[in-house]
Amino acid sequence: KYQRALNNWKNRKKSDWDIGIEYERYIGYKLECEGYKVTYIGATLGLKDMGRDLLATKNGKTLIIQCKRWAKEKTIHEKHLFQLYGSAAVYAIEHPITHCKAVFITTTELSEVARKCAEYCDIAVVENCPMGDYPLIKCNANKDGEKIYHLPFDQQYDKVVVSKNKQSCYAWTTYEAEGLGFRRAYRWHPNKS
């Protein structure tokens, strides 16, 4: 029943918001595979994310990442780079001991002016980075050691940390997650005794 729910969720009609979050999660997954600890800001704060979709930390360095999943015929203009630059500056001020780097990742291309602005502002840019398929089920152990899996429509999904250890992984299907000894996350109910 949970696999059917996941399949229905994957095949539903998606809003622009859903498409953006899906891309942020994909980029976050790729970074986690490279050993980064990823915080999903855009998915949890929405429009209040200040242009920071992801924070990815590894070896004392934090990447402040803005993701844009746009149609190929669209072009990214400089205002998006300026927003990221300002957001990275605020982050650096608020976290003075952290070495940080602004990174802009998109499925399309930047205008020539936007490229020059990125270079001037020392923003790393990844253009034409397509959305790919990846395992959507997050599996981890809770504070009591219970092995739990989370589906992308679960309330806490974007707060679940997946790291490279035996108690944490991604799975393609609910059957795979259950075969690894994980159970479905319970729905959270406030004031439950």
Q: What spans do the regions from the language model cover?
A:
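Acidic-basic catalytic patches of nuclease active cores, encompassing PD-(D/E)XK
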Residues: 1-42
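Generic structural signal for hydrophobic residues
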Residues: 23-27, 114, 173
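Catalytic cores of nucleic-acid endonucleases
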Residues: 59-62, 67-127
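Short, well-structured beta-strand/strand-turn elements
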Residues: 37-45, 181-188
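Active-site metal-binding core of divalent-cation-utilizing nuclease and nuclease-like domains
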Residues: 38-59
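Mature, structured domains enriched in cysteine- and short glycine motifs
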Residues: 124-193
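Short, composition-biased local secondary-structure segments
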Residues: 1-4, 70-94, 131-155
